[in-house]
Amino acid sequence: MTLTQLLQDKPPVRHDVQDRADIRNALSTKGQKLVVVDDDPTGTQTVHGIRVYMDWSIDTLLQALTRPDEVFYISTNSRALPPPEMRALTHELGANLLAASRKLAGETGKNVRLLLASRSDSTLRGHFPEEIDALLSGYGLEADGVILAPALFEAGRYTIDDIHWVDLGDRVVPAAETEFALDPAFGYTKSNLKEWVEEKTKGRWKAEQVLSLSLQTLRLGGVPAAFEILSQAKGGGAHRDQCGHLRGPGNSRSCLDAGGRTGETVRLPMRRLLRESSGWICG
């Protein structure tokens, strides 16, 4: 099967300039910063004009938070680490982000809302869900759900009808049928992301608990329709929101809302983003 055949019955791509403008405006006017935690150095190759930090000391993070940049990356290379070391590193990073934001508030009175994004591999390899758990724990945040959005259009990785696909040139195949799924550290057997979540979490989150944003919903209903579905995600991590075919530049993402006032944990419907498409986003 080709990508064209796979998409032939789908609605046309939705290009809503106003939606993008609203997102940028919200970041710039509401004191929000998107912090992308990147588990592999190759991830920064998909962005430009963005600062990338190689350490996450409180002083470095404080400098990053005081700059006018709306987005910055932190490169950890945690994908190359064994699980215990990854958890310690990611927990420390989350704790330092919280400490830096509190220090900024104490010294300047400025409260910054952090949108934490975890970026990982577009072929579903990485420390999922352990890395998200460690980041949340370090930051002291509970999540109502996770948005899993694996994709990297430039390399031919797409999510359509809940299935993650890899373009091999002459055809597209489910990700679990590729060599990537045989990775000795991060192997998997499921291409349906609902089932993949259950597999990777060892049943902690069941496939039937996963909500799905279809191309039809995104392209025909837009933001209001997506928000209605995402708002159903409640329960401190017991539910998960999986976004089909969502992508911006570079890999996969997950996002969490890190709270309204510095140091507070605020429960919102859409709280944490995972990391596929080479990333997750937590905010």
Question: Model-flagged regions — what are they?
Answer:
Residues 24-33, 38, 61, 68-70, ...:
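Cap/lid and interdomain-hinge subdomains that line or gate substrate/regulatory clefts
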Residues 51, 131-133, 254:
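Hydrophobic alpha-helical membrane context
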Residues 254-283:
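Acidic, glycine-rich loop-and-beta core segments that form the ion-binding/anion-interacting portion
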Residues 43, 153-157, 274-276:
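Short gly/pro/ser/thr-enriched loop/turn and capping motifs at secondary-structure boundaries
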Residues 74-79, 271:
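Short loop/turn segments at strand-loop or loop-helix junctions that form parts
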Residues 2-68, 154:
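N-terminal basic/disordered segments at the start of proteins
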Residues 45-50, 64, 83-87, 252-253, ...:
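Short, glycine/acidic-enriched capping/hinge loops at junctions between secondary-structure elements
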